[in-house]
């Protein structure tokens, strides 16, 4: 018999996460590693679990993630976004809870490009009056 799977794609900064939810005991596997091995800080791990905690589905699904691009914070945000989207396929009733927490909205903030003539995106060279 085919196993039930739910898919969700999450994005944050330059990271893209493809998330699969499979009925299981709550393991989170990121790029074939346990989440505790892959993501270094506890705060980011809690951030990833947020959609599961809000919908009270923390122990009922195994989360299988393939993520690339960006750093740890961006990847954690992308995983969280992907999990939230996958949970919508599990039960459309979760939409109100996830939307209220802001987990369904793609965080569009990305690093602003450096402009020529400036030292950074907005930082101007030091001004000398004379």
Swiss-Prot record:
MF (Gene Ontology): RNA binding; structural constituent of ribosome
Keyword S-adenosyl-L-methionine: no
Segment forming the signal sequence: none
Gene3D superfamilies: 3.30.230.10
PROSITE patterns: RIBOSOMAL_S9 (PS00360)
SUPFAM superfamilies named in the record: Ribosomal protein S5 domain 2-like (SSF54211)
Keyword DNA repair: no
Listed InterPro entries: Ribosomal_Su5_D2-typ_SF (IPR020568), Ribosomal_uS9 (IPR000754), Ribosomal_uS9_bac/plastid (IPR023035), Ribosomal_uS9_CS (IPR020574), Ribsml_uS5_D2-typ_fold_subgr (IPR014721)
Pfam family, one: Ribosomal_S9
Keywords from the named record: Ribonucleoprotein, Ribosomal protein
Similarity annotation: Belongs to the universal ribosomal protein uS9 family.
UniProt-recorded name of the protein: Small ribosomal subunit protein uS9
Organism the protein comes from: Geobacillus stearothermophilus
Lineage: Bacteria, Bacillati, Bacillota, Bacilli, Bacillales
Gene (name only): rpsI
């Amino acid at each position: 018999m085919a196993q039930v799977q739910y898919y969700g794609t999450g994005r944050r900064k330059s990271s893209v996460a493809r998330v699969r939810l499979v009925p299981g005991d709550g393991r989170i596997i990121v790029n074939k590693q346990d989440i505790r091995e892959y993501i270094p800080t506890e705060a980011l791990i809690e951030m990833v679990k947020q959609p599961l905690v809000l919908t009270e589905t923390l122990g009922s699904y195994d989360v299988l993630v393939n993520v690339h691009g960006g750093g740890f914070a961006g990847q954690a945000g992308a995983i969280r976004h992907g999990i939230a989207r996958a949970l919508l396929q599990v039960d459309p009733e979760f939409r109100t809870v996830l939307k209220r927490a802001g987990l369904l909205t793609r965080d569009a903030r990305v690093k602003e490009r450096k402009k020529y003539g400036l030292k950074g995106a907005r930082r101007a060279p030091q001004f000398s009056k004379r």
